[in-house]
């Protein structure tokens, strides 16, 4: 985003900016918040952020606060509330379905708050989020569920209706969100979050798998793209560093916002832009995420005014 605006307005290629290179060296030097070191990892030696959280659960725990995190219609959730609900859900998933380290749990629904809570819960208990395209039809769902080895599917009413058509082709357990229609084939979300928060620590290591996101596919089936906790967290810090560089170089205002940073979410959470660049990247800066059931211009304008939204993705 920054590159295209700057290249157009200032005819400056960031990759060739000596001031930027110097600042990167300063910001990533020993003792700094974004200190970088070379570490031997599976596949070779890589540069990593020394002070990055070790696993996604650390990211969530460090961001706990009473600031508003999610706004959906008339519902509001603080960072604390999201993490508390995720802890309850995580324990419910472990006890109800006897999940183990590395087991796959899929999410398929609209941009409901439950999407964010489920992501937090799954990655906090050492399991892997399979982020499913909510536009997929039944056969596409069947392929991804079987390809990923998913054990549990957390889905809303529309997605469960599609799953019901291919139920015999899979062996997954289903958790229903915001519907009572499918009680005969699904466990209710409400029952799972009725569990007490788990006191078990997350067993994930930095290079353990955290997510599987599917490509859109071209002439064949979509491909599952895996990411580890370390890869995701280092990406988040690299984006933070990039934003700080642009402030330092004068490309972005350095004025402190009067209101809490707030983003109107217009992209699906099943896409990396929604789940990573917006959702996960909102924890550390305590950014509020405002979403709608579906895109509506008048509602968006109303929310921008009411929530004092400063960005739109």
Spans of model-derived segments:
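Conserved AMP-binding/adenylation subdomain of ANL enzymes
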Residues: 233-263, 270-311
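Flexible, non-catalytic linker and terminal segments flanking ANL/adenylate-forming cores
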Residues: 2-52, 73
């Amino acid at each position: 985003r920054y590159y295209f605006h700057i290249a157009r307005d200032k005819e400056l290629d960031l990759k060739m900016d000596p001031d930027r290179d110097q600042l990167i060296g300063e910001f990533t030097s020993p003792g700094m918040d974004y200190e970088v070191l070379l570490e031997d990892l599976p596949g070779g030696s890589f540069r990593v952020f020394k002070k990055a959280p070790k696993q996604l659960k650390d990211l969530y725990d460090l961001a706990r606060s009473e600031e508003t995190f999610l706004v959906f219609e008339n519902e509001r959730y603080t960072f604390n509330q999201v993490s508390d609900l995720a802890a309850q859900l995580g324990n419910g998933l472990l006890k109800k379905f006897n999940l183990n380290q590395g087991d796959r749990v899929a999410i398929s629904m609209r941009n409901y708050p439950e999407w964010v809570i489920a992501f937090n819960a799954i990655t906090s208990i050492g399991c892997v989020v399979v982020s499913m395209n909510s536009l997929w039809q039944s056969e596409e769902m069947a392929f991804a569920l079987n390809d990923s080895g998913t054990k549990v599917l957390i889905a809303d009413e529309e997605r469960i209706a599609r799953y019901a058509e291919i139920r015999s082709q899979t062996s997954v357990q289903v958790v229903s969100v915001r519907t009572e229609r499918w009680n005969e084939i699904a466990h209710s979300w409400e029952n799972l979050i009725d569990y007490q928060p788990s006191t078990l620590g997350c067993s994930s290591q930095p290079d353990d798998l955290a997510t599987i996101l599917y490509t859109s596919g071209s002439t064949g089936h979509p491909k599952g793209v895996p990411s580890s906790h370390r890869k995701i967290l280092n990406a988040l810090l690299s984006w933070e560093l990039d934003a700080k560089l642009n402030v330092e170089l004068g490309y972005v205002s350095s004025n402190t916002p009067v209101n809490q940073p707030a983003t109107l979410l217009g992209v699906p959470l099943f896409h990396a832009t929604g789940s990573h660049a917006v959702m996960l990247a909102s924890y550390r800066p305590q950014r509020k995420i405002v979403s709608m059931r579906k895109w509506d211009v008048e509602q968006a304008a109303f929310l921008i005014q009411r929530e004092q939204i400063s960005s739109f993705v």
